[in-house]
Amino acid sequence: FRLDQWREVKDLLAEYYTFDESLYYSILPTATQYARNSIFSGLMPLQIEKMFPELWVDEDSEEGKNLNEAPLIQTQIERFRKKYTFSYHKVHDSQYNDKLLNIVPSLLHNQLNVVVLNFVDMLSHARTENKMIRELAQSEAAYRSLTRSWFQHSGTLELFKRIAGKGYKVIVTTDHGTIRVDNPEKVIGDKNTNTNLRYKVGKNLNYNPKDVFDIRFPDKAGLPSPCLLYTSPSPRD
């Protein structure tokens, strides 16, 4: 979820909420498995790996990298010696959103409710992988418009409406954004190199060092060290 996307939907909530905005940077790499896990745990990825190895999934593992989000939230609550009652929900589709709307009264008894709206993340990936979505969101203005249309007509807006007026604080945030890259850089690696387009991890990577931000000592950046880790795109993009 990008800042410009937030600006696009903010006025839809203005009737129901007042706003207090703050800006912050995502960690690197700007990928869900690192950035979102860090937000929920309140820790850098390397700290998660060391303190809660059972909750950290290595880069080369075939296991889902974001299956431990609720336990990571629990670790942060316990680390700060709080006794919050909380719930965790990941909204993948409209059916789950409808289910969430039906249980809003019971959720209001919790001190913390965490809701992951996966559509925006799915949209950013589909913009790269799906030809139809590429056509619909071929410009930044079109991308923002698509986000607004979804928000305006989805059950998500209804969820915000039902919470409004109950005296609760709602925090709308994101783990990372997206950048449309017009000048991609080529990073060549062996068969063990990961396939993620946002960043590359590998022992033998060939690239132009002038165009790629590389991290040769991942621990210095708070990252686990399966091998050398490099991130892209380059600053000029």
Language-model features, listed with the residues they occupy:
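Short secondary-structure boundary/capping segments
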Residues: E8-Y16, T128-E135, V181-N196
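Flexible loop/turn segments at secondary-structure boundaries
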Residues: R2-Q5, Q47, D121-H125, T178-D182
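Segments forming glycine/polar-rich beta-alpha architectures that bind adenosine-containing cofactors
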Residues: F1-L28
